[in-house]
Amino acid sequence: MKTFHKLIVLGGVMCALVSCEAPKQSAQGPQMRPATITGARRIANVRTTAYTHTEKGGSRNAIGRRLSGRNVMSAASDWSRFPLGTRFQIVGTSERYVIDDYGGALVGTNTIDLYKTSRAAMRRWGVRRVDIDILEWGSKEQSLKVLGPRRKHRIIRRMIAGLEKA
């Protein structure tokens, strides 16, 4: 009986120590933090790149609509990390985006590719690490619905596997 009590006390002490531990920075990707926008979730240090409609992918997003460069702008990601329909804002700006596209180079990364309306704007953006506020998470189900018929491609299968695992 004494051993049982010692184990309970030891377990309680271990739980208290673990819960007091400071969060560790991950070398792999962004960190979640509370956001300043009500109901939003902040993700710090997100790697972003830029693309435009004159590149290989053309002027349509993954769901067949024109890429948007106004109001809520188009963005691409690995949908297993940021699903189709995810809405976010870059902290410190009024720029709001919606994930409506994906790219092969993004699969397996925490990178978001931001749509820019010209090559000059794309080059100006370059590669930046920014904090974002997630305003609304996209839909795993919608992502799978769009990706399902395209599963013959290896990168699509990787996104599907990530979505099904989540």
Q: Language-model features: where?
A:
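N-terminal secretion targeting segments of exported proteins
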Residues: 1-26
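Solvent-exposed, well-ordered loop and adjacent helix/strand elements within mature globular domains
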Residues: 21-166
